[in-house]
């Protein structure tokens, strides 16, 4: 699974996921499913935000990468992916600037057009079950919830899906492709079922013991499917900005 994640996702997303797991004391070598889930969630958050801007008239517009316009403002503020201290600093700044009610839990995004925080969910289960779990945890009508599944289903607060159909279809297609690629490598069942994941981990550990000391040959080739799977959605200028702000090392 770890190899799949490193081949499948944008390097910046992998780096952010590693940082997040380290912050919470989790070992990505053991919690490989969580590593994959975090990367998937991060990518959906970035895809949700990318190419969406607010023009000088306050209208929401879509601008593809490479169309420069200094008067445009990003519609969404990305909170997910930042360390907790910085994330809360961003949330507090948004609340002070916009007058929005401070959420009890860290949300994933802030929508400057609708003036609301957004909680993004990506589930391997039924969307309505995961939606209810999120709603019960957040207990706030102010935070908008939007859930996506790997089967193309989605559910949002008051059936308000925020994004246009094409943008949402892009996210659904990406999730479905990830599922198909996992399945083709025999990874999907263990990703869905914790019990299956434990069984697979024991099997892997046992096979590692049996193979200890044997010469190994590692292939670094990328399959044609994974070449097309690699996301090309990120705005290159914004990628550089995000990398600088999200991955900045604290001064000693």
From Swiss-Prot:
The active site is at residues 80, 108. One of its GO terms (biological process) is viral translational frameshifting. Keywords: Decay of host mRNAs by virus, Eukaryotic host gene expression shutoff by virus, Host gene expression shutoff by virus, Host mRNA suppression by virus, Host-virus interaction. The record marks 195, 198-199 as: Important for efficient shutoff activity and nuclear localization. The record marks 202-203, 206 as: Important for efficient shutoff activity. One of its GO terms (molecular function) is RNA binding. Gene3D superfamilies: Influenza RNA-dependent RNA polymerase subunit PA, endonuclease domain (3.40.91.90). The keyword Cytoplasm does not apply. Pfam families: Flu_PA (PF00603). Plays a major role in the shutoff of the host protein expression by cleaving mRNAs probably via an endonuclease activity. This host shutoff allows the virus to escape from the host antiviral response. Hijacks host RNA splicing machinery to selectively target host RNAs containing introns for destruction. This may explain the preferential degradation of RNAs that have undergone co- or post-transcriptional processing. Belongs to the influenza viruses PA-X family. The probable endonuclease active site in the N-terminus and the basic amino acid cluster in the C-terminus are important for the shutoff activity. The C-terminus acts as a nuclear localization signal. The C-terminus is recruited to host protein complexes involved in nuclear Pol II RNA processing. This is Protein PA-X. The gene is PA.
């Amino acid at each position: 699974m770890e190899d799949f994640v490193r081949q499948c996702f944008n390097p910046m997303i992998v780096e952010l996921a590693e940082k997040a797991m380290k912050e919470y004391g989790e070992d990505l070598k053991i919690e490989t499913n969580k590593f994959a889930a975090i990367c998937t969630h991060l990518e959906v958050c970035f895809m949700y935000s990318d190419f969406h801007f607010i023009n000088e008239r306050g209208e929401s517009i879509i601008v593809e990468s490479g169309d420069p316009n200094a008067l445009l403002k990003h519609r969404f503020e990305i909170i997910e992916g930042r360390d907790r201290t910085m994330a809360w600093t961003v949330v507090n700044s948004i609340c002070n600037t916009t007058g929005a009610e401070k959420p009890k839990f860290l949300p994933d995004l802030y929508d400057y057009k609708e003036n609301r925080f957004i909680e993004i969910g990506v589930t391997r289960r039924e969307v309505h079950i995961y939606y209810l779990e999120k709603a019960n945890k957040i207990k706030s009508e102010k935070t908008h919830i939007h859930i996506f599944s790997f089967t193309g289903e989605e559910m949002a607060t008051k059936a308000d899906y925020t994004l246009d159909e094409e943008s949402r279809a892009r996210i659904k297609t990406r999730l479905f492709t990830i599922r198909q690629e996992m399945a083709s490598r025999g990874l999907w069942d263990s990703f869905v079922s914790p019990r299956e994941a434990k069984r697979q981990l024991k099997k892997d550990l046992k096979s590692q013991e049996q193979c200890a000391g044997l010469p190994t040959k590692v292939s670094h080739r990328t399959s044609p499917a994974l070449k097309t799977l690699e996301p090309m959605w990120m705005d290159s200028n914004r990628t550089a900005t995000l990398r600088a702000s999200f991955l900045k090392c604290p001064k000693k």
